[in-house]
Amino acid sequence: MPAPTDHQLFDLGDLPLQSGATLRGAQLAYKTHGSLNADRSNVIVHPTWFSAWHDANEWSIGPGLACDPEKYFIVVPNQLNNGLSSSPSTTPPPFDGPHFPPITFHDQVEAQHRLLTQQWGIESVELVLGSSMGAGQTYQWAVSHPEMVKRAAPIVGSSRTSEHNQVFLKSLRATLTLDPAFRGGEYSPDARPTAGMRAFARIYAGWGLSQAFYWEREYRSMGYSSLEDFLVGFWEGFWLDDDRDPNNLLAMLWTWEHGDVGRTPGFDGDTEAALRSIRCPLVAMPARTDLYFPPEDEQWASQFIPQGEVRVIDTIWGHFGGLGMNAADNAFVDRTLQELLDRPV
């Protein structure tokens, strides 16, 4: 599926990064749903997940849903590195391709904060929500701008990337970069590391969905006739898309791997202290069978958040239980979001 084109670009100008580099002429791609009201008090922020573009969030946006564009002004910022916002594939030298500087969740949120405050003069946000890497950005919003965020809902994500999760991410990086066609990230557009990307897809297939999903052969409900049909048609088909640039994927992997709200300036690596600083009600929604972000990760974090709560998505769809793939899981997420939005703050 090609990258969407129904977005706008916000000029960030020069964006200082936590690495010490400055991303000059940076741009943030975004899409909005609904209208901003007169006092700018109806804002929802919904960041994107790994490899996803803004359209991947649209399952949770619509009339009658919690994220209702008839009530709210919903901003969906594309994270840096995803190919629409400033990324290795879109940036000229000296930060082109493999030379693109590392981006943290803090950097992502500061870019989004510029968009909200400079483009629309927004001072408060009713809800920040996001899935997977979007959940990491949600936690970061609540820590970086507690005066601004009224509610937060991280879905199938975490406040700190666990070492077990890092093992998965390192395996993806290794398999992609070991393809001879990768050439240290200086690959030709006409000779992309497709062998590495096929292996990347096969590794992802074993982590993104649960053991029970495969035991029940749930892929048949998606229209695939066999395991091999699913691996080729769904997984390889997704990752071999021409618009999914390998350097962009590696840059997003770095952000994911180094996710930790404790790295927010002022907390000196103390994740627990960063979580204690969150002022708003925060309802985390891990999936029971998620191999990346198991419920235990969120239960650990929740004990430090003054108004923290965990609602587990009871699903066999693993990580995909929070990505809009299954109607029952979507309904659970939407009900939980509605309850959170109805809560006085």
PLM features per residue range, with description:
Residues 1-43:
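Catalytic-loop region of hydrolases
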Residues 95, 99, 106-126, 140, ...:
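Conserved acidic catalytic loop of the alpha/beta-hydrolase fold
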Residues 154-239:
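Alpha/beta-hydrolase-fold enzymes
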Residues 264-271, 280, 291-303:
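Short alpha-helix in the alpha/beta-hydrolase fold that links the catalytic acid
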Residues 278, 284-286:
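Short beta-strand/loop motif that positions the catalytic acidic residue
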Residues 299-303, 307-345:
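Catalytic active-site module of serine/aspartate enzymes centered on a nucleophile-bearing elbow/loop
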